[in-house]
């Protein structure tokens, strides 16, 4: 196993190797774009009943962990991670906040919907989605618990983080909890940090890339581990939620 690992690294650091693999995946995604577009539907046409403007009188809480992966990577929520999310959802004031997730309806983002149903928590859940989605994603977005969608001008799903910036981070304060992802989630965190709204950002440092991002943005983000009592910290930092 050590031999195979050393061969994989080929003189690179673990970080360099991971980023190199991501770059390959992103190139494959670009090459597959034409095929993906052929097999996609227009979001505005197929989901017109769901289109809405994001609320301005509530605090947006962005949960990242499912939609922010390059091709070939999937987010599998951990038991501890789901406990954190459940505890958080139990403690928020649904009159003061709403959730914003990505378009894939997977991982921790899907768990927001499932846990809200389980707890019968009447919280608004919206999604920011690209101009084109697959039939499978369209069907997931039709879930009755997703109140509305905001359509990004981006055709490519890896670029939707730009719309999170324009629609949320540049306009208002938000709370960002990044559970998982790779390069797209790093872009999201960076946009949240740069935005005029001065968002509060919490990142799961059990994810190696998010840990490195937290080190880079030390003082601007709060790193946590799934077994930490991070929910109390988030509530304490953001009494308005």
Regions found by a protein language model. Give the residues of each.
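Intrinsically disordered, low-complexity regions enriched in serine, threonine, proline
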Residues: 9-12, 33
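Extreme N-terminal basic, low-complexity initiation segments
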Residues: 2-9
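C-terminal functional extensions of proteins
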Residues: 217-241
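Amphipathic alpha-helical oligomerization/scaffolding segments
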Residues: 21-22
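Short, positively charged and aromatic/hydrophobic N-terminal segments
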Residues: 13, 17-18
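Acidic/glycine-enriched connector segments
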Residues: 34-50, 54-57, 64-226
């Amino acid at each position: 196993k050590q031999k195979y690992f050393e061969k994989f690294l080929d003189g690179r650091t673990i970080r360099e190797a991971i980023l190199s693999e991501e770059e390959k995946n992103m190139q494959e995604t670009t090459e597959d774009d034409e095929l993906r577009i052929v097999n996609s539907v227009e979001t505005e046409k197929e989901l017109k009943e769901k289109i809405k403007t994001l609320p301005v009188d509530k605090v947006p809480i962005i949960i990242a962990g499912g939609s922010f992966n390059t091709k070939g990577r999937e987010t599998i929520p951990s038991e501890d991670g789901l406990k954190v999310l459940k505890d958080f959802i139990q403690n928020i004031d649904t009159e003061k906040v709403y959730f914003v997730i990505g378009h894939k309806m997977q991982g921790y983002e899907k768990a927001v919907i499932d846990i809200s149903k389980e707890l019968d928590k009447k919280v608004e859940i919206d999604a920011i989605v690209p101009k084109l989605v697959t039939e499978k994603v369209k069907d997931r977005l039709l879930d009755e618990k997703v109140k509305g969608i905001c359509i990004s001008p981006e055709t490519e799903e890896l670029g939707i983080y730009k719309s999170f910036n324009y629609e949320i981070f540049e306009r208002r304060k938000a709370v960002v909890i990044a559970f998982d992802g790779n390069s797209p989630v790093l872009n999201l965190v960076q946009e949240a940090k740069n935005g005029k709204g001065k968002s509060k950002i919490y990142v799961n440092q059990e994810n190696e890339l998010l840990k490195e991002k937290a080190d880079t943005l030390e003082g601007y983000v709060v790193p946590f581990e799934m077994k930490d009592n991070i929910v109390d910290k988030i509530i304490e930092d953001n009494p308005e939620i």
